[in-house]
Amino acid sequence: SPETQEQQQAAPEPRVLVGEVVITGATGQLEDEIFRVISTRAGQATTRSQLQADVNAIFATGFFASVDVKPEDTPLGVRVTFLVQPNPVLRNVTINAVPEGLERRVLPQQVVDNIFSPQYGQILNLRQLQEGITKLNQWYKDNGYDLAQVVDASKVTPDGTVTLTVAEGVVEDIRVRFLNKEGQPTNEKGEPIRGRTRDFIITREVQLKAGDIFNRQTAERDLRRVFGLGIFNDVRLSFAPGTDPRRVVVVVDVIEKNTGSIAAGAGISSASGLFGSVSYQQQNLGGNNQTLGAEVQVGQRELLFDARFTDPWIAGDPYRTSYTVNFFRRRSISLIFDGGDNEVELENGDRPRILRLGGGVTFTRPLSRDVFTKAEWTASLGFQYQRVSIRDADGELAPQDEEGNDLSFSGTGKDDLLTLQFGAVRDLRNDPLRPSRGSLLRLGVEQSIPVGEGSILLTRLRASYSYYIPVRFTNFTKGKGVQALAFNIQGGTVLGDLPPYEAFALGGSSSVRGYDEGDVGAGRSYIQATAEYRFPIISVVGGALFVDFGTDLGSGSSVPGDPAGVRDKPGTGLGFGLGVRVQSPLGPIRVDYGFSDQGDSRLHFGIGERF
C-alpha cells in the first residue's frame, strides 16, 4: 500500500560497526591526507552512504586516479579497506591543438610551463591541474582568443606527462552577409539581402584569414577598417559553424548606406552672371568603393567643370596603392594679383581671373609591406597638365595689368604648365583629426617640363613640419578633452622660371590670421610659423589661442612683375588671436578672430584644424 511504501522509504540505512580502517595503495603523506578527509573511523558506526561520501572526498583531493572501497566482516567488526591508485609525479604538460594538422598554435610552450612548473616534481593533483587549466583559458581571453579553450585533459601517461587538448578557434572561412536597415539578413519573402558592394572590397580589409586563430583584437581592427571605408552604416561580426565542428566561419555583417547624391542649383554673380550648376557624387561606384565626383557650372560667361575619380586600392595590388584622375576647368580670383594697400587692376577696372584647364593623375601608396599596419611614410607620384590663362570678368584675355606688368610668364596671357609631382608624408600623430601628441612631416617636389606657351622650367620645393605636445595648463577642462600645444613651421621656394600666379601667397585663414587672404605678400620663397594652445571647453566645443608669422624672405621683388610690391604688401606679417572649434560630421568647424601687427582685425572661417 502507499502507506507501507512511505514507511519503507523513511526507514534508516543499516549501520555497522567499523572494526578497522585500512588504506591500500598509499603511504606517508598521501595516507595521512586520506585519513584527514574521510569520516569513517574504527570503533564508530558507518553506512553505505558514508562510505561513498568518503570515496568522493578522496577523489576530491585530486591526488588519485582511482578510488574504491571494500568492506569485510571480521570478528571485531567490519574492516573497511580503501583501495587507491595515486596519480604519477607530474613531469611535463604538453598541448595538442585541434583540429589535428594545424601548422601553428598561438599558445607558447613557455606560457604553459610558467603556469604548471610549480607543480612539476610533485604528485599530480587534478584539482591544481584544473586551476592551471583555468589560467590557460584566461590567458587566451586576455590575449583576444575568445573562442579558444581547453576541451580535454584526460590523457595522463604513467611517466607523468599530461596532454591538454585545446580548440583554439580556427577560422574556416570569411564570409560577407548584407543586412537590411532593420538588421535582418532576409527580405519579406525570405530571400537573402543582396548588396551593391563586391565581397572582396570587404574581405581585403580583413586581416583574419582562413586557417588563422580567431583573435578579438584583430577582429576589432578589421571592423574599424571596414567601417572606415565610409560606405556602411553598421559593421559587425557573427559566427557560423564550419563543416568541421572544431572550426568556425566568421561572418562580416554589413548594412550599406546610400553612397550617391545629386544636386542642382542656380544663381547670379558678378563673376559668372546668371548660372546654373549640377553636381554628382558616388562613393561606391560599381560596388568597388571607388569615388566619382563631378560638378558642372554653366553661366552666361563661362563653362566650368571639375571631375574626379579615385580608386582607393587598385584591385590586385598588394601594397594598397591608390590613384586619382581629375579633369577641370576652374576660374578664381588670384590672391597674387589681389589685395594690398594699393589696388592694381586690369585696364578696364576688372580684377584678374585665373582660368585653369587641364587634368592629371596621382598615385599614392603607404610605404609598408603590411597593409594592415598604419605606415609611418606615405609617398605620392603624379603629373598634371594645365593651360593657364589670365582673363577679365567677361572672359577676355588680359595679359597685363593697368601698369603694364605681365600677368603670365609668356606675356601673351596664356601659359602651358606640365609638371611632375612627388610627395612624401611621415605621420606620427595619435589622431589625424584632433592630434595632441606626435608629429607630421610633409615634403613635396614639383618639376615642370618646358612645353607650349612660355616653355616654363621650374622646380618647386616645399616642406612642412608639425609637432604636438599634450599639456595641462588648466584644470577646469578635466574630463572634457585633451589640452595640447601645436607647432607648425613650413617653407618653400621656386627655382628657375616663375609664372607670377605660381608665387607663394601669404596671409589669411591658412597663413597669417588677422590679415586678409594674400595680404601679407607673394614671394618666390617663404617661411611661415604658427604656435597654438588648444583646449576643450565642453565636449563638442574647443578653444585655441594662436600666433602666426609669415615672411617672403625678401623674395617678392623676384616674382615677375613684382605683384606684391606694386600693391604695397609688406612681405612680412605677424598675427595673433583666439578661436573656437565646433565638432561636426564634416570635422571641426574653425572660427578664428585674429589681430595683425598692422592694427587690423579679421574673422576667419574654415573646416578642420589649421594643421
Residue ranges of each PLM-predicted region?
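C-terminal beta-signal and terminal closure region of outer-membrane beta-barrel proteins
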Residues: 558-611
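Secondary-structure transition/capping motifs at alpha-helix termini
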Residues: 254, 258, 284-288, 315-320, ...
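Short Gly/Pro-enriched loop/turn and capping motifs at secondary-structure junctions
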Residues: 301, 538, 550-554, 587, ...
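C-terminal outer-membrane beta-barrel translocator/porin domains of Gram-negative envelope proteins
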Residues: 396-555, 560-562
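Small/polar, glycine/serine/threonine/aspartate-rich low-complexity segments that form flexible
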Residues: 260-272, 497, 555-572
